[in-house]
Amino acid sequence: MKKISAGLLLTDGAKLLVCHVTGRNFYDIPKGLVDDGEEPTAACIREVREETNLLIKREIIADLGVYEYTRDKDLHLFLLYRRDLPDTGNMGCSSFFINKAGRRLPEVDGYRYIALKEKEIYLTQNMARVIGTALTI
């Protein structure tokens, strides 16, 4: 059975919040695996808080559905449209991992807003494809 990640598209219609993945050469949306017994909406809210320190409420996000992401993982996307986007300078990551050298590092080490039309420049090919599909339905 495929794993499910839940993620948030935080946008004003032209720009999208992306997070720089520590140690990698690409950005990603705030997302993460849905734990056993966890609702995708709750997983999305939890992952956004862990990766950005943003507190979002269930009532203000729209469920965009589940999309085929990789061979072994699907992506359950949620949308938060805001005319005034939060300041990336106030964002921070409280979720860590241990790298190959044994150092404890944040999963995310930077934030920016990208133009939706430039998503292929910053995101992986699969993520750009899924977002393009989700936002055109």
Model-assigned labels for residue ranges:
Residues 1-29, 78:
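N-terminal strand-loop-strand
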Residues 40, 123, 127:
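Hydrophobic (often cysteine-bearing) scaffold residues that line and stabilize catalytic clefts
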Residues 105-106, 118:
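Preference for well-ordered, secondary-structure-rich cores of eukaryotic proteins
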Residues 34, 116-119:
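Hydrophobic pocket-lining residues within nucleotide cofactor-binding pockets
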Residues 29-63:
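The catalytic Nudix box helix
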